[in-house]
Amino acid sequence: GYLVQGLGVKQLPADSILLWVVTFVAYGCLYYWKHRFGHQWRIMWASHSAHHQSEEYNLSTALRQTSTDYIGFIFYLPLYLAGVPTEVIISVGSLNLIYQFWVHTEHVRRIGFLEWVLVTPSNHRVHHARNPEYVDKNYGGFFIIWDRIFGTFKDEETDRPCVYGVTNQLGSFNPLWANLYVWYDTFLISLKTKR
C-alpha cells in the first residue's frame, strides 16, 4: 500500500466484478511463475521444499507450509502497480490457497474435461511426485492452463504411479529441520564455492 501510494498509483475500484475476474486470472499467472521459480531458484526452493518433503499425499500435505517465504510477494508487485486494491489481491490469493488445499488428495482420480483447465488432484499429484518424468511439472495453483501454455504440463500416467517426496529425502520428521535444512545445505554449498 505505502509503496503504491508513494508512486502515485491510482487505485482501481474494488467493487468492480471485472476487476475481480481479471485479478483472479492475473494472480493465477503470477502464482504460476512464483511457484515455478520456487522450484528452480535454490533460495526460493529453500522456502518451499518443506511442502514437498512428505512421502504421503493427503490433505495434511497442503498444511505443510513454509515459515521462511520472505520474497514471494515480489511476484505480485505488478498487481499493486496496476492499481489493484490490496484487499482484492489478498482475497484472490486466499481463494487460490483454499482451492489448493482440496487438490492434495488421492481419493479423487480424474474429473473429465476439467483436467484441461483447472488444477485437479490428478494434476497436482504429478507436481508432488519425485518420479523423474514428473519432476518440475504442473506449477499452476487454480488454472492448469499456464502449464499447458508454458510447456510444464504433464499428465498423470496410470502405468506410472506417483512416488511422493523430494529427490533427496530429508530423513527427519522434525518440522524445524524441515524448514531449515535446505537453507543450511545452501550455506554449506556457498562455503565450498570458489571465490
Sequence positions of predicted segments:
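Juxtamembrane/interfacial segments at transmembrane-helix boundaries in multi-pass membrane proteins
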Residues: 1-21
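A membrane-cytosol interface segment of integral membrane proteins
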Residues: 160-195
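Membrane-embedded catalytic scaffold of the fatty acid hydroxylase/desaturase
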Residues: 14-169
